[in-house]
Amino acid sequence: IDVSLVGSEMCIRDRPKDYNSYGSRRGNHEVMMRGTFANIRIKNEMAPGTEGGFTKLYPEEKIMPIYDAVVEYKKRGTDLIVIGGKEYGTGSSRDWAAKGTKLLGVKAVIAESFERIHRSNLIGMGILPLQFINDVNRKNLKLIGSELISINGIENGVNPSDHLTVEIKYLSGEIKKIKTLCRIDTKNELEYYKNGGILQYVLRNMI
């Protein structure tokens, strides 16, 4: 743990005897943000040859911890999208999987399919889940992480199960447009998303 971002953060705060597990730190957003996407079994296709919470910062093409890259993108005002495969979000600690994603500045997740509870939790955090359709996926789109991705039409609002156009601009200048399925499945979920998440929805209905 002494080489991880979480370990470094806790060393700074003088708690080396109390590291314990992520589960014991679920109330500490600084720890949990740094732990999001940090599972040692994760292999980020943007950063080949690495395991765990690493990515490649663009346009510098620099391999670095995901959290550090997020901090840099926030400075630049760059919104983030996660691209995933099948059953995206499967695993334990599902609530923090969505909370951490939100805190890292992710606006949408585009995947081949979603684990049921995680899809719902993403919406509860105000994150838009989109699903690839028509046999399109990250591999046949040849995505490497340097692309600029725009989701067309969301500024005008979305509806459950809408088909939304995603525009992908490659470094070469090539532009591809694909259809995706909006995985906001119900009117209640739509209200949560429109309000920026379930907590904001509840607060606005209380005031």
Identify the residue ranges that each predicted region occupies.
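Single conserved hydrophobic/aromatic residue that forms the stacking wall/gate
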Residues: 1-7
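Fe-S-dependent hydro-lyases/dehydratases of central metabolism
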Residues: 8-207
